[in-house]
């Protein structure tokens, strides 16, 4: 059992994916609060927008790590979400700060539904990725 760079990448990805799961849960709860009108859209967007860039940067960091470790299958599984993150950030509304959510448009029913679906899809992806990284870490540690 040898400790390789690939094993380190899987361990770090496992820990950071746990943080991304919490980000996705926060995202889902925040948009549910907006849907049920428990919270002001301006306050909600002010709490959601600072989480966008760290989430995207953590995921991009995963992709760079797995590229350096030559874990091609793992990189291939992460590339569609990375491409989506890049597209989503490039097509964001024009605002003064970094973020995706504009308080003036977030209460539109179609945008709110889209953001909720996005949160649920990301939660599913991060949960599956968590268990895949756990399997990959065990496999790399045992097979070396």
From Swiss-Prot:
The chain crosses the membrane at residues 11-31, 57-77, 123-143. Residues 32-56, 144 are lumenal. It comes from the Eukaryota. Highly expressed in heart, liver, skeletal muscle, pancreas, adrenal medulla and cortex, thyroid, testis, spleen, appendix, peripheral blood lymphocytes and bone marrow. Lower expression found in brain, placenta, lung, kidney, ovary, small intestine, stomach, lymph node, thymus and fetal liver. Expression is up-regulated in dorsolateral prefrontal cortex of patients with schizophrenia (postmortem brain study). Residues 1-10, 78-122 are cytoplasmic. InterPro entries: Cornichon (IPR003377), Cornichon_conserved (IPR033466). GO terms for molecular function: signaling receptor binding. The keyword Amino-acid biosynthesis does not apply. Disulfide bonds: none annotated. Keywords: Endoplasmic reticulum, ER-Golgi transport, Golgi apparatus, Membrane, Transmembrane, Transmembrane helix, Transport. One of its GO terms (biological process) is signal transduction. GO terms for cellular component: endoplasmic reticulum membrane; endoplasmic reticulum-Golgi intermediate compartment membrane; ER to Golgi transport vesicle membrane; Golgi membrane. The keyword Membrane applies. It is found in: Endoplasmic reticulum membrane; Golgi apparatus membrane. It is a multi-pass membrane protein. Belongs to the cornichon family. Interacts with AREG immature precursor and with immature TGFA, i.e. with a prosegment and lacking full N-glycosylation, but not with the fully N-glycosylated form. In the Golgi apparatus, may form a complex with GORASP55 and transmembrane TGFA. Involved in the selective transport and maturation of TGF-alpha family proteins. This is Protein cornichon homolog 1. It comes from Homo sapiens. The gene is CNIH1.
